[in-house]
Swiss-Prot record:
A Pfam cross-reference name: HpcH_HpaI
Catalysed reaction, written as an equation: (S)-4-hydroxy-2-oxopentanoate = acetaldehyde + pyruvate
Residues annotated for Mg(2+) binding in this entry: E151, D177
Residues the UniProt record annotates as site (Transition state stabilizer): R74
This protein's pathway: Xenobiotic degradation; biphenyl degradation
Record-given protein name: 4-hydroxy-2-oxovalerate aldolase
Active site: H48
GO cellular component, one term: cytoplasm
Family: Belongs to the HpcH/HpaI aldolase family.
Organism: Rhodococcus jostii (strain RHA1)
Keyword flag Protein biosynthesis: no
Length: 258
């Protein structure tokens, strides 16, 4: 059996636009509903969503049945043990939060690579199909997509250095935490924050790496794409469910009491 090729990593390297969707429900059943929707990629959120290793595994399994949809996973932190566990589950693309410096980015890359280029521990796991991919240890490093999140003022000051780290495939701008870091908590739409986001997208692209971002606002998604974003998540399952169920209930409440 041949180790799988990471189509998402290839698309980022080629600068091909990838439209995605955020999974925060922590549920494989709803993840499969989204996997068939037509998105290029889905992000399984292990930082803010109620996840554990088994819930992430279940979502990787159901999304894996949809060949045109790639599963990426956000780890809860840059902890090397956590990164190893998520990679062993079979995640090929990781999003690592709160990376502020080039040294931190380089440490993330090392955690994702086997020796001698890194420190990832070797063990029989789903990623190698329990040894059925005979060359997995030799091929895995080239197929792991490493994306780090720049989401503080400090990260923006180090953006080029972070992007230029060998092994970093993309830099994702975390708009909510960035807004808080810049003094506008809860207001990523503030003009100063938006200017910083657009500037960051262009700087990452100029450094030769793929910039990414998340927004459930369609006009902003289009703006980010126009300013160089390569991979954009255009919605969140929890946000969409809350918004649409509230709107539906409100419409029928008006009918009931009219």
């Amino acid at each position: 059996m041949q180790s799988p090729i990471n189509s998402f990593k290839k698309a980022l390297a080629e600068g091909r636009t990838q439209i995605g969707f955020w999974l925060a429900l922590g549920d494989a059943y709803s993840a499969e509903v989204c996997a068939g929707a037509g998105f290029d990629w889905l992000l399984i959120d292990g930082e803010h969503a109620p996840q554990d290793l088994r819930s992430v595994l279940a979502q990787l399994q159901v999304i894996g049945a949809y060949r045109d949809c790639h599963a990426a996973v956000r780890v809860p932190s840059a902890d090397t043990t956590v990164i190893k566990q998520y990679l062993d589950l079979g995640a090929q693309s990781l999003l690592v939060p709160m990376v502020d410096t080039a040294d931190e980015a380089a440490a993330v890359v090392r955690a994702c690579r086997y020796p001698p280029g890194g420190i990832r521990g070797v063990g029989g796991a789903r990623a190698s199909r329990w040894g059925r991919y005979p060359r997995y240890l030799h091929e895995a490093d080239e197929q792991v997509c490493v994306v780090v999140q720049a989401e503080t003022a400090l990260a923006l000051s180090n953006l080029e250095a972070i992007a230029e780290v060998d092994g970093i495939d993309g830099v994702f701008i975390g708009t909510a935490d960035l807004a808080a870091s810049l003094g506008f908590p809860g207001n990523p739409a503030h003009p100063e924050v938006q200017d910083a986001i657009l500037d960051a997208l262009q700087r990452v692209r100029a450094a030769g790496k793929a910039p990414g971002v998340l927004t459930p606002v369609e006009d902003l998604a289009q703006k980010y794409l126009a300013h160089g974003a390569v991979f954009v998540a255009v919605g969140i399952d929890t946000h969409l469910l809350a918004k649409q169920t509230s709107a539906l209930a409100a419409r029928f409440a008006q009918v009931a009491y009219s």
